[in-house]
Regions:
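Alpha-helical recognition segments enriched in aromatics with Gly/Pro capping
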Residues: 1-20
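Feature 926 captures the class I aminoacyl-tRNA synthetase adenylation module centered on the KMSKS loop
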Residues: 2, 23-328
């Protein structure tokens, strides 16, 4: 009565790892109730776009978002197929939970959400409803009541079109490059938001973003989404450092945030120095491992190659950080 049937089912299953005793705690039911609320809030957001679709003959700026989530959904389906075959039901629920809460609600819906009182592209809206339906099918065995209700509220159904008897679509092949670009976009957004916060730039303060990268194609594929998420009026691709800006390093790429406001570089310098210290320590640990002849001779070739890639990435990042520090 306190949490509801779906939340209790969720709480029991999320705390039931295969082969182990049940480590149930009432907080698991609270997590299930919060998940219920998250689903309803996502439904409310999507229903707000109902009747506000607009057909567009132009390339849709949010097309990367739908493409990425389609591949992310299929990637999760392939993982879930293996988990169900091995009866790893609790692990499967955790995968579905993360897919819905993190990838769909926290990222995808934010990427496709139109501006205030703006219409959403009809193709994007239809894809979003389809994704929501697919997610409810995946979650249905664990939380049957809320998923069935949301499934029917997403759009009108014919008699007998019930999620409980509907066959789920099989997973299709995924594209690793699209998934990698999605992961890159998430990392860049998170990093640049943190940079804005540390430099006391308010969410409403606009910036211009300059990107120094060897892989412009990846950024061009999601340029519009990135600009919207960090409130950038323009995105420029440059081949050298831009002075008078806030700089940041993500992976091997450098970002320069240009603002009309007066900038304090002290916090920016402190962040870069901390990152530089960490990267140098990480590089030293990798070097130590690679200088051990017993490790190189006895470890699997792919393990040694992975360590060498780690070394190359760390060296590239150290170089990028040092170049950013030089511009301050």
């Amino acid at each position: 009565d306190k949490y509801g049937a779906d939340a209790c089912r969720f709480g029991i299953m999320i705390a039931s790892p295969a082969g182990n005793d049940l480590l149930w705690d009432e907080s698991s039911n609270e997590q299930g109730r919060n998940f219920n609320n998250k689903l309803w809030n996502a439904l409310k957001l999507v229903k707000m776009w109902e009747g506000r679709q607009a057909d567009s003959n132009e390339p849709v700026a949010d097309s990367f978002a739908t493409l990425w989530f389609e591949h992310r959904l299929n990637e999760a389906k392939l993982e879930l197929d293996n988990m169900f075959k091995e009866f790893r039901l609790s692990e499967a629920l955790k995968t579905i939970y993360s897919l819905i809460w993190d990838d769909f609600c926290s990222w995808y819906l934010e990427w496709v959400k139109p501006g205030f009182e703006q219409p959403i592209d009809k193709a994007v809206y239809d894809k979003t409803v389809f994704f929501f339906e697919e997610l409810m099918q995946l979650l249905h065995p664990y939380m049957p009541f809320v998923t069935e209700e949301i499934y029917h509220q997403l759009k009108e159904r014919t008699a007998g079109d019930d999620i409980t008897i509907k066959q789920s679509a099989a997973a299709t092949a995924t594209d690793a490059s699209i998934l990698a670009n999605g992961a890159l976009l998430k990392e860049v957004i998170s990093s640049l938001r943190e940079v804005r916060l540390k430099n006391q730039l308010k969410p409403k303060d606009t910036i211009q973003l300059h990107i120094e990268t060897a892989t412009t194609e990846a950024y061009q594929s999601f340029e519009t989404i990135l600009a919207k998420q960090i409130n950038a009026t323009h995105v420029h691709f440059v081949s050298s450092a831009v002075t008078g800006t806030i700089s940041a390093v993500v992976q091997k790429d450098k970002f320069y945030l240009q603002s009309e406001l007066e900038l304090d570089t002290s916090s920016q310098k402190e962040t870069l120095l901390k990152d530089l210290e960490y990267q140098k320590g990480f590089l030293a640990s990798v070097d130590k491992k690679l200088s051990n002849e017993r490790f190189v001779q006895n470890a699997k070739p792919e393990v040694v190659e992975l360590e060498r890639r780690k070394k190359a990435d760390a060296e590239a990042r150290i170089k990028a950080i040092e170049e950013s520090l030089a511009t301050l």
